Amino acid sequence: MSTSHSKAAKQFLKDQTYAHWHDATFWAVRTKRDNMAHGLDEWEQLREKASQIKRHTITHLDEYLDQFATAAVKNGVEVHWAKDAQEFNEIVYGILKNHNVKKMVKSKSMLTEECGMNPYLESKGIEVIETDLGERIIQLKGQAPSHIVMPAIHLNHDDVGELFEEKGISNEKGNHDPTYLTYRARLSLRNEFLTADAGMTGGNFGIAETGDIVVCTNEGNADMSTSCPKLHIAAIGLEKIIPNYECLAVFQRMLCRAGTGQPTTTYTSHFRKARPTAHHMHIILVDNGRSEWIGNGEHWESLKCIRCGSCMNTCPVYRRSGGYSYSYFIPGPIGINLGMLRDPQKHSGNVSACTLCLSCQTVCPVKLNLGDQIYQWRQQLDDFGTANPQKKLMCKGMSMVYGSSSLYNFGTGLAHWANFIPSPLMNCGLNPWAEGHKMMEFPKKPFHELIKEIEK
């Protein structure tokens, strides 16, 4: 009854030293988040307010998108609409081609990962340089992000040091000191900023009232990516729009506290129009399924997500299986839900990667009911034709047993004889539970018989 996730997680757990480090690292981030949350008396009120803002905006998204686009055009920005990933990539390429761009630097954007923009542009002969350090590391390594906020968290400083030596970024063999490696990365990226023809940013928020794009970073790379190049392209999903700066103030107090346990991001950059050094600014608003998801009565609230990553940091399954165990490019609880919205046939294996502990709901800054939604997805697997046939057979059997008192009493009366089954048989492939658990001993008397004796 293994799923694609459980098979990948099994591979991840083969290196127990690394698996323990991965678990402890994310729990430390969760602890920092808790300390920050407990330091604000109004934390729960902020969560409720943030949830209300996102709910209101998404249920009135057509109005706010129109307001945003109108304001952006008044600011002198060219606004584009992309219905899907293919159109988004074509729009980006068209803009770059019109400006004779050969090299583009960009800050971190999960939207461009979603649309497969980098490989598309590279196939057209345009060099794309990731400038977020974590993203740059995995770009050089040819990997995808394993976390939406800390994309290279699965690599340690020795991995990065060896990579930098291989790519010629580091010139001191064996020096894997993080401070030194960061310094060498800065030197390497500095030339890219100065020689790029275009800069691209994502956007944490789009302000409908003013047409502004707001980007939060800890490295200042969004500012650097838009300071020297003469062209700035900003790309955001439709759900990133919020009404005004009063609403932004709520999210700015929560985003970094929830995601990394910091009071705020080091840099919060506001882009209303092309910077003095740039000649042109374009904003691309991307649908790629979002307008359809809004109509999903049970799961549309996943669009409230502000991509802080806190649900991953706390999730016991993500912490112990890693980001690459999931089939969707966003892992963890939010990735399970978004992946199912995207393609339930392709990503249904991820819904098993949840204990339903609901810790994700406890920490989510916008009060997303992630665990409840995952439970609902599980109930729908048969409708999608992806329910596990073995589980279906077992459930039918259990339904028969629990639906008949005589069958139930007969079964519980025989249960203790399972204690005498030889261990190799009990732990064989027919019993997947035994792969990760020690089988319990069955009592001689079932609970309902013990209760009867006690009540005499």
Positions of PLM-derived features:
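The feature marks the mature, well-folded catalytic cores of soluble enzymes
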Residues: 1-298
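Intrinsic disorder at enzyme termini
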Residues: 1-25, 29, 39, 394-456
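Helix N-cap / loop-to-helix initiation motif
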Residues: 84, 311, 369-370
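Ferredoxin-type iron-sulfur electron-transfer modules in oxidoreductases and energy-metabolism complexes
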Residues: 275-302, 317-427, 431, 435
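Short Cys/His-rich zinc-binding micro-motifs
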Residues: 305
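Accessory "access/gating" subregions that flank catalytic or transport cores
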Residues: 309-312, 319
